[in-house]
Amino acid sequence: MRRIAILGVTAPALFLSACAGGGSGGTRAQPASVTPAVIVSPVLISAAAYVAAASSIDLYEMRSAQLALERARDPATKVLAERLLASHQGTSAQLSLAGRRLNLLPSAELDPDHQAMLDALNAASDFDSAYLAQQAIVLQDGLRLHSGFAKSGTSPTLRPVAQNAESVLRDNLEALRRSR
């Protein structure tokens, strides 16, 4: 269940606006610009939903990396693709092993969003730029998924997989930053 808590800032804002009331001859205080803070609690997802999402990310990363090895022009992009291919083969194998223990097999198909991204990448005229832009999106999405599940996942069997994948994706994001 998604819970969003908005921190109360109304009382201080009202107090400040009351203090800003007209006085004799002094400068008027400007109302404070107050932006409420939004805190989003971790979203609890099932083990099955985690396996499905994580396997689609791994599959997208492997397929896009294979495409990059064929189409990329910049040698640094190819080096990044080799790294991402190897690391996601590893995370995919770990996910598959842990998933089997729970009778949850990773999907062999991309989810519709990842399939659309792969199709767009395949059609891109400036492949290297498109590849790097998509990597930034997918790696950040993956990091959020794995980090959230590592902290509050429903499966003790999958939490260590998520913790490892979180570390791998942090390293991959850093490699992406260096390659730009």
Regions found by a protein language model. Name each.
Residues 2-8, 19-180:
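His/Met- and acidic-residue-enriched segments that coordinate or traffic transition-metal cofactors
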